[in-house]
């Protein structure tokens, strides 16, 4: 469809030699090129910086949003569906199932677009911001402390209706997709990120500006946690769950069909860092850095602390006298660097401590007793 999009923003800003502020509110709405995939968002942004004295400055920033995400469907299946299959059967007034060689993997995308339209209600909330203080002292020193936080809360409910399609390969030419039962599911997810940074910087020039030095030392902490709960229930015998958002709650379904799941983890890092940047006459460049990181994700291995460093150098040749007459070349720099890196952001929250998952069971004894089997979900 031809979609309607609107973006609306209003803001207030002001500044003086010692104070600046900003406040903005926005609203966005997208109808979506695919029917029933509308999206809307309300945002608020605020910031304030205040220069208390010539050497002391404080401020904050806040961003908030409420989003109603699109009721997304598997429309990309249209790219994979065979082009010879009819989309709709006029005689039966039903959408068609795809041919036998495809229908086990792919549904007719129009079934999702039309028959499963508006079957998801979700709300996403997010708030993030920071406060900071910055002080200059002893002419060449600067110290900045910042505390940041990011909080997200997402929840949603989904309804699965009974969907019938035209399928000439079954008796009566009408097939029911899935289990043939209405179903509701719910989820709720919260994630928190907290970070603090403390950075001391020394900047100075010597010998009439020929030697320029910037040295930085810092200490940072980071905390991240996530908690998610999922649940679903199907209808009871003869008790169809109505297609009414006010009734899309798992408490309405048959308790005997309940399924649930959860995900939760938390971890933190602590880092100490130092960096030196030096140049001579702006042409000969050097930098070196060192950091020591500790991560709770590896605490069970006794190897949670690691050291990382980097060294780099450069030569800005275009600033040399013998390059001044080359007009067609604006800048020429030769540089090289070497360093070590680490990564804790793997697809597992605890890469060093794998969880157990179900495996093949075994039967022993008379009478027979089933012994459930377990295995490591992944190798550490």
Labelled PLM ranges:
Residues 16, 95, 341-344:
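Gly/Ser/Thr-rich beta-alpha loop segments that engage phosphate groups in nucleotides
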Residues 21, 82, 86-89, 95, ...:
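Generic detection of intrinsically disordered/low-complexity segments and helix-coil linkers/edges
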Residues 1, 5-7, 76-112:
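Acidic, glycine-rich flexible loop segments
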Residues 9-11, 93-98, 116, 236-240:
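Short acidic/polar alpha-helix capping motifs at helix-coil junctions
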Residues 1-36, 73-75, 113-118, 133-136, ...:
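Residues embedded in well-ordered regular secondary structure
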Residues 167-168:
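Intrinsically disordered, compositionally biased low-complexity regions
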Residues 41, 47-56, 61-66, 76, ...:
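Extracellular/periplasmic, surface-exposed regions of secreted and cell-surface proteins
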């Amino acid at each position: 469809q031809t979609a309607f999009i609107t973006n609306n923003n209003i803001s207030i800003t002001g500044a003086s030699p010692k104070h600046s502020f900003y406040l903005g509110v926005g609203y966005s709405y997208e109808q979506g090129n695919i029917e029933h995939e509308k999206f809307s968002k309300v945002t608020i942004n605020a910031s304030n910086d205040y220069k208390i004295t010539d050497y002391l400055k404080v401020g904050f920033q806040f961003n908030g949003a409420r989003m109603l995400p699109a009721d997304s469907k598997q429309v990309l299946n249209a790219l994979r569906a065979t082009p010879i299959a009819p989309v709709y059967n006029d005689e039966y007034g039903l959408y068609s199932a795809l041919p036998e060689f495809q229908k086990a993997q792919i549904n007719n995308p129009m079934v999702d677009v039309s028959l499963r339209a508006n079957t998801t209600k979700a709300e996403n909330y997010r708030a993030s911001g920071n406060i900071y203080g910055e002080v200059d002292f002893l002419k060449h020193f600067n110290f900045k402390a910042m505390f940041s936080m990011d909080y997200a809360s997402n929840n949603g409910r989904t309804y699965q209706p009974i969907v019938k399609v035209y399928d000439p390969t079954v008796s009566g030419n009408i097939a029911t997709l899935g289990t043939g039962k209405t179903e509701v599911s719910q989820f709720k997810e919260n994630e928190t990120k907290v970070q603090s940074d403390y950075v001391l910087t020394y900047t100075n020039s010597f010998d009439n500006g020929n030697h320029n030095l910037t040295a930085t030392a810092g200490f940072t902490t980071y905390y991240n946690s996530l908690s998610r709960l999922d649940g679903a229930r199907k209808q009871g015998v003869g008790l169809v769950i109505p297609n009414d958002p006010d009734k899309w709650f798992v408490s309405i379904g048959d308790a005997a069909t309940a399924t649930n799941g959860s995900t939760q983890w938390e971890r933190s890092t602590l880092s100490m860092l130092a960096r030196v940047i030096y140049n001579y006459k702006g042409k000969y460049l050097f930098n070196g850095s060192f950091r020591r990181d500790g991560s709770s994700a590896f605490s069970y291995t006794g190897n949670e602390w690691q050291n990382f460093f980097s060294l780099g150098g450069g030569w800005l040749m275009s600033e040399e006298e013998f390059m001044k007459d080359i007009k067609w070349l604006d800048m020429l720099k030769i540089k090289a660097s070497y360093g070590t890196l680490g990564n804790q952001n793997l697809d597992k929250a605890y890469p060093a401590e794998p969880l157990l998952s179900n495996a093949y069971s075994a039967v022993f004894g008379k009478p027979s007793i089933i012994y459930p089997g377990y295995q490591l979900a992944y190798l550490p």
